[in-house]
């Protein structure tokens, strides 16, 4: 029997209608896996050995009672076959420390989804620089004068921090906007932090597409997140509306170009953000949108994921 651990935010607070981690647990349970639940505070390191307090778990699609803890134990993480790291950002120093603990288990043979080193290496915004032929025009800088020159060149730009999620602190600065200076100062904290500028993509009106990639293979359907009227952010957390769709030709092209690199880096479950035919982000920490896509199309994304995990476990 496969023992699957999951590190996540408190399961008591999730919305099971939309939660991708919950969907993964349902599929793992359906396959007869033993489920071990952990929060960040359960992980620890003693003399180089990664351990945790885990609670064995059963889950069900029931809005009144969706989980039950069936036991509690303290065990070496190496006792688990696979661990899903599903803690939501912020990607802060605490998150980084947890990846070192998970990496000690990985060294003992546990499969970690996604690979701890790659979680540290691949910032969701900056990792797109490795695929710059697919992205909008992009500037990463602390320098206000460079941001101003970029804005003057493109006249309509998006500014964002490198560590936001859910559309937080994303600004659109149009031609003639008097606020560029103060936005640049705010995002760079007066030149002490990097921020990202990209030319505005009018295709955002048709949605910001979340394309999921499972161990290098694109899922054939995506979720287009369509901004509310007058809004430039499609994120569901920012009030956008989700619309599942089949991938377009350019979506396939982008996902197939990036897929092999993701697979090689042990990034087994990844969410690409695509606007029009441009790649804007590569989400590696805790990608979502499984449930919305599965509700609309005949595809089991969690099935693809568990198949990929089983294939990797057999190779070990």
UniProtKB/Swiss-Prot annotation:
<keyword id="KW-0317">Glutathione biosynthesis</keyword>
<keyword id="KW-0436">Ligase</keyword>
<dbReference type="GO" id="GO:0005524">
    <property type="term" value="F:ATP binding"/>
</dbReference>
<dbReference type="GO" id="GO:0004363">
    <property type="term" value="F:glutathione synthase activity"/>
</dbReference>
<dbReference type="InterPro" id="IPR006284">
    <property type="entry name" value="Glut_synth_pro"/>
</dbReference>
<keyword id="KW-0464">Manganese</keyword>
<keyword id="KW-0547">Nucleotide-binding</keyword>
<dbReference type="GO" id="GO:0005737">
    <property type="term" value="C:cytoplasm"/>
</dbReference>
<dbReference type="InterPro" id="IPR004215">
    <property type="entry name" value="GSHS_N"/>
</dbReference>
<keyword id="KW-0460">Magnesium</keyword>
<dbReference type="InterPro" id="IPR011761">
    <property type="entry name" value="ATP-grasp"/>
</dbReference>
<comment type="similarity">
    <text>Belongs to the prokaryotic GSH synthase family.</text>
</comment>
<dbReference type="InterPro" id="IPR016185">
    <property type="entry name" value="PreATP-grasp_dom_sf"/>
</dbReference>
<feature type="binding site">
    <location>
        <position position="283"/>
    </location>
    <ligand>
        <name>Mg(2+)</name>
    </ligand>
</feature>
<dbReference type="InterPro" id="IPR013815">
    <property type="entry name" value="ATP_grasp_subdomain_1"/>
</dbReference>
<comment type="pathway">
    <text>Sulfur metabolism; glutathione biosynthesis; glutathione from L-cysteine and L-glutamate: step 2/2.</text>
</comment>
<dbReference type="Pfam" id="PF02955">
    <property type="entry name" value="GSH-S_ATP"/>
</dbReference>
<feature type="binding site">
    <location>
        <begin position="151"/>
        <end position="207"/>
    </location>
    <ligand>
        <name>ATP</name>
    </ligand>
</feature>
<dbReference type="GO" id="GO:0046872">
    <property type="term" value="F:metal ion binding"/>
</dbReference>
<protein>
    <recommendedName>
        <fullName>Glutathione synthetase</fullName>
        <ecNumber>6.3.2.3</ecNumber>
    </recommendedName>
</protein>
<keyword id="KW-0479">Metal-binding</keyword>
<dbReference type="Pfam" id="PF02951">
    <property type="entry name" value="GSH-S_N"/>
</dbReference>
<keyword id="KW-0067">ATP-binding</keyword>
<feature type="domain" description="ATP-grasp">
    <location>
        <begin position="125"/>
        <end position="310"/>
    </location>
</feature>
<feature type="binding site">
    <location>
        <position position="281"/>
    </location>
    <ligand>
        <name>Mg(2+)</name>
    </ligand>
</feature>
<dbReference type="InterPro" id="IPR004218">
    <property type="entry name" value="GSHS_ATP-bd"/>
</dbReference>
């Amino acid at each position: 029997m496969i023992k699957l651990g999951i590190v996540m935010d408190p399961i008591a607070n999730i919305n099971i209608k939309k939660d991708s981690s919950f969907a993964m647990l349902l599929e793992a349970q359906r396959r007869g896996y033993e489920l071990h639940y952990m929060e960040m505070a359960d992980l620890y390191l003693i003399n180089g050995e990664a351990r945790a307090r885990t609670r064995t778990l059963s889950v069900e699609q029931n809005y009144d009672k969706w989980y039950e803890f069936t036991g509690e134990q303290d065990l070496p993480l190496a006792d688990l076959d696979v661990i899903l790291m599903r803690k939501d950002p912020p990607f802060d120093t605490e998150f980084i420390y947890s990846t070192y603990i998970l990496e000690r288990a990985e060294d003992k043979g546990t499969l970690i989804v996604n690979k701890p080193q790659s979680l540290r290496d691949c910032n969701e915004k900056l990792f797109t620089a490795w695929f710059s032929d697919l992205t909008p025009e992009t500037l990463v800088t602390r320098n206000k004068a460079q941001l101003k020159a970029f804005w003057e060149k493109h006249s309509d730009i998006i500014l964002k921090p490198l560590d936001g999620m859910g559309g937080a602190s994303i600004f659109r600065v149009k031609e003639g906007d008097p606020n560029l200076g103060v936005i640049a100062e705010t995002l760079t904290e007066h030149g002490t932090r990097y921020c990202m500028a990209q030319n505005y993509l009018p295709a955002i009106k048709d949605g910001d597409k979340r394309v999921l990639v499972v161990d290098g293979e694109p899922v054939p359907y995506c979720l287009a997140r369509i901004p509310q009227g007058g809004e430039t952010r499609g994120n569901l957390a920012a009030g956008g509306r989700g619309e599942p769709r089949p991938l377009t030709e350019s979506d396939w092209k982008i996902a197939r170009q990036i897929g092999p690199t993701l697979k090689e880096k042990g990034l087994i479950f990844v969410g690409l953000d695509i606007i029009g035919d441009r790649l804007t982000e590569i989400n590696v920490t805790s990608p979502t949108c499984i449930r919305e896509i599965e509700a609309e199309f005949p595809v089991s994304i969690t099935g693809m994921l568990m198949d990929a995990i089983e294939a990797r476990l057999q190779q070990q």
